[in-house]
């Protein structure tokens, strides 16, 4: 009964819950982004072995955010977390031009997953503060985002340690999910 009341209350007052996966190669800044969004500050992080999960309340949406480790050995396990996902935040280290091709391959593999067909995609072109970082247009080209025709997506330049661009991306994501597109 309590769950039914909670769902009715949420639907009347516009609250929504969404399951979000934060994916990307190792050292892209996924965990820094998660805790910047949740706590509003930068926390010291170590490479994620497995996952971190936190709730982020934003713009009348309760995001259940799953930050999955990005090491090569962990990536095959990402698919275990795909069911019931409304959105993917794909984080790219814009300064790691040596691995942008690998980031593209992993990204397009994710897009092909049947269990993520209905998920909207938010790309964070992270680490914009570092020398040689690709801007959002260059990351768009490198990831071949123009090939995405069957789902809504957006890309935002971000700097997780400074908090730049993150909430603009979350605004887009929450508005997209509220409009029922996600």
UniProtKB/Swiss-Prot annotation:
GO terms for cellular component: Golgi apparatus. CDD domains: Arl1 (cd04151). GO terms for biological process: protein transport; vesicle-mediated transport. Keywords: ER-Golgi transport, Golgi apparatus, GTP-binding, Hydrolase, Lipoprotein, Myristate, Nucleotide-binding, Protein transport, Transport. GTP binds at residues 24-31, 67-71, 126-129. Its EC number is 3.6.5.2. Its main location: Golgi. InterPro entries: P-loop_NTPase, Small_GTP-bd, Small_GTPase_ARF, Small_GTPase_ARF/SAR. The keyword Hydrolase applies. SMART domains: ARF, SAR. It comes from the Eukaryota. A lipid is attached at residue 2 (N-myristoyl glycine). It is found in: Golgi apparatus. It catalyses: GTP + H2O = GDP + phosphate + H(+). GO terms for molecular function: GTP binding; GTPase activity. Signal peptide: none annotated. GTP-binding protein involved in protein trafficking; may modulate vesicle budding and uncoating within the Golgi apparatus. PANTHER family: ADP RIBOSYLATION FACTOR-RELATED. Belongs to the small GTPase superfamily. Arf family. This is ADP-ribosylation factor 1. The lineage of its organism: Eukaryota, Viridiplantae, Streptophyta, Embryophyta, Tracheophyta.
């Amino acid at each position: 009964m309590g769950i039914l009341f909670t769902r009715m209350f949420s639907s009347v007052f516009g609250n929504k819950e969404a399951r979000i996966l934060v994916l990307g190669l190792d050292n892209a800044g996924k965990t820094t982004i998660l805790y910047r969004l949740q706590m509003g500050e930068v926390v010291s992080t170590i490479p994620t072995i497995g996952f971190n999960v936190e709730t982020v309340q934003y713009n009348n949406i309760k995001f259940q955010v799953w930050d999955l480790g990005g090491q090569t050995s962990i990536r095959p396990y990402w698919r275990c977390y795909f069911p019931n996902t409304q959105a993917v935040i794909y984080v790219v280290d814009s300064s790691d031009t040596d691995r942008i091709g690998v980031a593209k391959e992993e990204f397009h593999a994710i897009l092909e997953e049947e269990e993520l067909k209905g998920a909207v995609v938010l790309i964070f072109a992270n680490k914009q503060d570092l020398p040689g970082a690709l801007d959002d247009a260059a990351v768009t080209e490198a990831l071949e985002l123009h090939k995405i025709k069957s789902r809504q997506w957006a890309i935002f330049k971000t700097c997780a340690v400074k908090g730049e661009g993150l909430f603009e991306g979350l605004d887009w994501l929450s508005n997209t999910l509220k409009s029922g597109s996600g």
